[in-house]
Amino acid sequence: YEMSASLVGSEMCIRDSTLAVKVVGGPNLSLYLDIVKNGDALLSTDNLDYYEFRMEDPVNLDNRMQYVVSFRPRVSLMYALFIGKLYIDYERLSFTRAEFGLDMANRVKAVEAILHKKPVGLRFRPQEVAYLVTYKQQGTKTYLNYIRNVIRFKCDWKKRLFSSSYTAFSEMVVTDRTESPLSGISNKNTFKRKQVFYDLVDEYWNEDFWRNYNIIEPTESLENAVNKLRKQSN
């Protein structure tokens, strides 16, 4: 559960009446959501006992038939669980897609799973925490392809009549893949799962910061960025 909380955790601060939202996890956020590599995020042996699974009608995705398995909590725990669907390829029996979100039945548990800290007097009301993970076949294997995380919530101040709606959105797409021996990363250079990327990069808004790295600027749409990267690689 600790990992689940860190996936969607966020911090809030107020500057000049502007609400700033910081998502904890930075570059690691998407990698934690790879449910195949990180079974503890959803599919660990212990977690499976907490859910009720059901076979739904099969569907066709990209001209391939898929088993559809829906799941929802069958027990009540001290923390919020998930509701969603898993799509499994008929022939390969590998994951094609996972759609899941935080169970909002108990808003107190949902807040505990999402929010790390907020300003005094601010009321935080979660509306949705949704994830989408897709996988794509390359050769004889299926690899991670795309990850999206959406957090929708409302905030207002005590003694104020109206609330405001906000959305924190993050996504990752795999543009290219090469297989080569891995080299270890020193602990000093490792990005911790509870760190905030924005706080660690002093020149975050400096145009020269991004240079030629395979990184998408926060103000650029994912689709345009991917097309640009593909043109550069050709």
Predicted regions and their residues:
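Bulky hydrophobic/aromatic content
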Residues: R15-G25
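N-terminal hydrophobic or amphipathic segments with adjacent small-residue motifs
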Residues: M3, L19-A20, M78
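Edge strands and adjacent loops of beta-rich recognition modules
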Residues: G26-P58
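Gram-negative outer-membrane assembly/targeting C-terminal domains
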Residues: A168-N234
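Gly/Pro-enriched, hydrophobic low-complexity segments
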Residues: D40-L42, F53-E56, R64-L182
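Short, small-residue-biased leader/transition segments that mark boundaries at the very start
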Residues: Y1-I14
